[in-house]
């Protein structure tokens, strides 16, 4: 059984903005977040502002740290009834 490959690339920009808003709301700088997730501050800047895709591990660390539900970004047509923060 062959799995069809979807060639669309996920637009990370909205999640990046959600991470930025959550980081700012917590009073954390890009430099502090970069230190915590072991990345360069410019990498955090690119993730937040330019929609650059982080590694899965970095992505997971950031969304769990700020309690960001990603369902609304991956499944925009579905309403997830979860009690997690909606930052955007």
What residue spans do the PLM features occupy?
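A short, Lys/Arg-rich alpha-helix, primarily the initiator
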Residues: 1-25
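Short, charged recognition helix plus adjacent turn
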Residues: 1-4, 74-88
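Helix-turn-helix/winged-helix DNA-binding modules
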Residues: 14, 25, 51-54, 65
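Recognition helix of helix-turn-helix/homeodomain-like DNA-binding domains
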Residues: 37-54
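Alpha-helical DNA-recognition elements
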Residues: 46, 50, 61, 79
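DNA major-groove recognition helix of helix-turn-helix/homeodomain DNA-binding modules
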Residues: 57-72
């Amino acid at each position: 059984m062959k799995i069809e490959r979807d060639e669309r690339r996920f637009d990370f920009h909205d999640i990046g903005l959600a991470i930025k808003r959550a980081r700012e709301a917590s009073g954390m700088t890009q430099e502090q977040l970069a230190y915590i997730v072991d990345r360069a501050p410019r990498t955090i800047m690119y993730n937040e502002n330019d929609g650059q895709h982080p590694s899965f591990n970095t992505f997971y660390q950031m969304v769990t740290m700020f309690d960001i539900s990603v369902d609304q970004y991956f499944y925009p047509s579905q309403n997830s009834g979860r009690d997690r923060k909606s930052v955007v």
